[in-house]
Amino acid sequence: MGCAPSIHTSENRTFSHSDGEDEDVDVDVPGPAPRSIQRWSTAPGLVEPQPRDNGASKVSVADVQFGPMRFHQDQLQVLLVFTKEDSQCNGFHRACEKAGFKCTVTKEVQTVLTCFQDKLHDIIIIDHRYPRQMDAETLCRSIRSSKFSENTVIVGVVRRVDKEESSLMPFLAAGFTRRFIENPNVMACYNELLQLACGEVRSQLKLRACNSVFTALEKSQEAIEITSEDHIIQYANPAFESTMGYQSGELIGKELAQVPINEKKGDLLDAINSCVTVDKEWQGVYHTQKKNGDNIQQNVKIIPVIGQGGKIRHYVSIIRVCNGNNKVETTTECVQTDSQTDNQAGKHKDRRKHSMDAKAVSSRTSDVSSQRRHSSLARIHSMMIEAPITKVINIINAAQENSPVPVTEALNRVLDILRTTELYSPQFNAQDDPHATDLVGGLMSDGLRRFSGNEYILATKNLPPLSNNLATPVSLHDVPPRIALAIENEEQWDFDIFELEVATQNRPLIYLGLKTFARFGMCEFLQCSETTLRSWFQMIESNYHSSNPYHNSTHAADVLHATAYFLSRDKIKETLDRIDEVAALIAATVHDVDHPGRTNSFLCNAGNQLAVLYNDTAVLESHHVALAFQLTLENDQCNIFKQMERNDYRTLRQSIIDMVLATEMTKHFEHVNKFINSINKPLTAQESEEPDRSLEDIKAMLKTPESRALIKRMMIKCADVSNPCRPLEHCIEWAARISEEYFSQTDEEKQLDLPVVMPVFDRNTCSIPKSQISFIDYFITDMFDAWDAFVDLPNLMQHLDDNFRYWKGLDEKKLRSLRPPPE
């Protein structure tokens, strides 16, 4: 990946300056290669001064010492981001040449992220003086959103102001490391670069080196635990967690348990304390308990680590499980510690009486679990022990104890799977279809996922804006004939929503909604007038964006139609209560209200206020349902809930919220798999045993609140993405609309220099058939198979098969368009 033509890179060379202001200063900082130059003897790790070489200003590189680790710093790279090459830009450019740093200059904001990801500069200097020409803080956030920028130093050049300074918090919150008050003097810029190189850059280099240390700890077969001076667990490697039976990360931040010690162990604690409090490591054998309560014998080495102020700041415990045949004998020894610390100024002088006896070691020296009292870890166990997943893990741990090696290894793999956070989400490996993998990841993630695509340019009609020429109907008896004809067969699955869209001038929701709600007796249940319901529909539809190709009121009407169709199926009518039907129809109506035509990932990457408000979690879904209730409740003329009893309203509200949140794709596989395991499989099992006797059991099982919630979530999910199950022409039109909306998002991401969440939806490189095939394969088929098994929807499944064959046929012909070329 290369940089744009406007970016110029200086070659690595030594420059001589005879200018009076460019006085030669020779400092040991990260540079091109070791040379014979003068260095400051006062700086740590620098050699003695040497004679100047004809006044030439040179900078050399030095090895960096980090504890016992020593590594080499490559030539430092600097990226200058200025909209114009003024004196300040030139000052930094000349300073880079003077220091021998590689320098890249870019004047085009849209090329910055690409250039940075290509070169991975150590320092980025951004011009923050002219916000109208360049939004420096947004650019900085964009850079920080890249995983490669974690150790990059970003400097903002600001104006020199005479008035009182304001807080730097917004500046730092944007991701800047420090600021530089404008000063075009070359030596001022040079000195700034030297300070950065010897300070922040070197510190970041050491932090990067920590990755290798943590890798060694993570892969070590020895169990290692690190605690603070107050015995708060700061780190436990996988070997430790596996040895003690804990889940990954479960112990971090927890205080070690305070456990009563029996009399036989008192001498052991005294021996440990006598060692560690005088900066000596202790090594010996003692007993401890695993999470499941089993006692194990361990060979333990406890090492105190001296830190700031010459005091003990950490304890490192290295543990090996002893062979079960060993005798229970405790042997201890003190060894003078020679571990490297971050402060060698002095030894530990503060011998705290309670350094280990009540916390770190005491939790490991108890032989009887009944002696446990109200310690922090015991409280944690009491909270978690009732969790079903914890019970499963404990049972598997117990089964491993006396199992053969192959069985133990297989159970370990089972535990690894159970300990993942996404138990219901599929995991893809390198052999999977990259296109499908990227599509699935992009639709299910609030973070960044990369896609690939093929060539395609969509030619679709521009939808006209919402028209006000069509009068709002006073009642269902006041509907114009053309619209009445368009909604005549709305109870049928093959109902043409696009015909209604044209007839209503892009206002299908209010007309379809009034008829559907009347069919289900919504006004009677809500105890509201048809006038109130009509005003509510008008208000909701006006908050859908008609400018969106896909997420507009036509999509809402389509989802409402599908939901009503599902509610009319016999199995659903037998299962759901009246309030469930009402909740489902309202949820379908409002499920995408005020949708901006952009994905959750886009809003999170752009720092949108909704993403901030909802903590980057289910951003749009939370907004849709919250806004729907806000708009409804703040206006009496639209408040369809006004006459409801308090308890009924709260039940209805909770059900609506639950259904709208279920449309978030990050939980797709969780909802589908729960439905299969909790509804489909029990039904199949009961029906196959004794059909007559199990009929009542089946009804009772389906009527539970948990089962009804699963069914309602599945219903709105299927209604929301039912496009591939519609007649072919409808399916093609929906594919065109969603593709155009995603194309528009990709265009805007590139324009704003944001991470491109779905590169597969580039209007110049997209294969619509491939995207539809992947979507059907990974999201639609299994879900509708499960839904069909419960509801019985043969017509939908036939459409799904026909549409899949259509897209497959286009793809096999290497076509990227919506339709084959005319013959």
Swiss-Prot record:
Residues 283-325 form the PAC domain. InterPro entries: HD/PDEase_dom (IPR003607), PAS (IPR000014), PAS-like_dom_sf (IPR035965), PDEase (IPR023088), PDEase_catalytic_dom (IPR002073), PDEase_catalytic_dom_sf (IPR036971), PDEase_CS (IPR023174). A divalent metal cation 1 binds at H555, H591, D592, D720. Phosphorylated at Ser-355 by PKA under elevated cAMP conditions, this enhances catalytic activity. Its cofactor is a divalent metal cation. The keyword Metal-binding applies. Binds 2 divalent metal cations per subunit. Site 1 may preferentially bind zinc ions, while site 2 has a preference for magnesium and/or manganese ions. Pathway: Purine metabolism; 3',5'-cyclic AMP degradation; AMP from 3',5'-cyclic AMP: step 1/1. One of its GO terms (biological process) is cAMP catabolic process. Its EC number is 3.1.4.53. GO terms for molecular function: 3',5'-cyclic-AMP phosphodiesterase activity; 3',5'-cyclic-GMP phosphodiesterase activity; kinase binding; metal ion binding; protein kinase activator activity. The modification Phosphotyrosine is found at Y456. It catalyses: 3',5'-cyclic AMP + H2O = AMP + H(+). Residues 475-814 form the PDEase domain. A divalent metal cation 2 binds at D592. The keyword Hydrolase applies. Disruption phenotype: Reduced phosphorylation of Mapk1/Erk2 and Mapk3/Erk1, both basal levels and those induced by EGF treatment. Residues 1-55, 338-373 are annotated as: Disordered. Residues 209-280 form the PAS domain. Pfam families: PAS_9 (PF13426), PDE8A_N (PF23198), PDEase_I (PF00233). Hydrolyzes the second messenger cAMP, which is a key regulator of many important physiological processes. May be involved in maintaining basal levels of the cyclic nucleotide and/or in the cAMP regulation of germ cell development. Binding to RAF1 reduces RAF1 'Ser-259' inhibitory-phosphorylation and stimulates RAF1-dependent EGF-activated ERK-signaling. Protects against cell death induced by hydrogen peroxide and staurosporine. Belongs to the cyclic nucleotide phosphodiesterase family. PDE8 subfamily. PANTHER family: CYCLIC NUCLEOTIDE PHOSPHODIESTERASE. This is High affinity cAMP-specific and IBMX-insensitive 3',5'-cyclic phosphodiesterase 8A. It comes from Mus musculus.
